[in-house]
Amino acid sequence: VDEFDHFIDNNNLSEIAYSDKSYEEIKEAFIQAELTPCLKEKLRNYLEVMKKPLAVRSSGLFEDSLSQPFAGVYSTYLIPNNDADMVRRALELEKAIKLVFSSIFTEGSRAYFRAIGSMIEEEKMAVIIQEVVGNEYDGKYYPNISGVAQSYNFYPFSYIKPEDGFAVLALGLGAYVVGGEKTYRFCPRYPRLHLASIQDMMRASQQYFYAIDLKNKAYNLEHDGEDAAIKAYDLKTIEEDGNLTHCASVYDFMNDNITYDFNVMGARIVNFPNILQYDYIPLASTLDTLLDIFSQA
């Protein structure tokens, strides 16, 4: 968080940041401000070796709070990091960092601080820069699977116990999952237990996915926000990329059942059958072990 303090102090941002100015005004002031020369050099050295898309994430002190949840309060920016010009890549990374710094002062964040009775002046922001997990497919960059898991299930059914936990999976970037879109829900301890009928699975099945658009050179983090470099694609695209085989089934309307034969004409149902039913990768057992460890931590 030292860099955050230097950034605020060196650029005289305290007056506007902690005022009642609009976030747009604060954001513009942050973007026009300068990071320290030392940090700029470190970022350029990092970009010399890191050529994959990057996630620029918040790590505020209050996000470690045990008493108040801060998930989703601050911003995360995904950048393609694929420009041929190193200077432009560095400037884009610097802008993303400044925008994460400024996300403390969004209207939503300030309202949240007021609601929980905390002082926004006490918040300090560090930034985490991570390689985005995934691969490139014809100008798109995304992971095959993303998801979240929780060690306690408030809505168990059948022989599932609350402490067995649950997980939700989706194709593509995790922004789809945390955005509350249609995902596949299962219990890692009992991954073969179907939680819905065929009709319900069809209604609740994922219809599109998110990927970083590597071909878009005109994205604008400042004006388009966290989703500036992200684009939605339909399932046909991911099937053409060859990434649907282990992640979906096909509804055979002639026989009113589910098949794993993609030569059959029918709606694709994203339910990860080869992974959860046949252990193509040990995802369920791995999640079950991790949830057990985390619940005891």
Where are these regions (language model features)?
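Conserved mixed alpha/beta core segments that line enzyme active sites in large multi-domain catalysts
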Residues: A33-A297
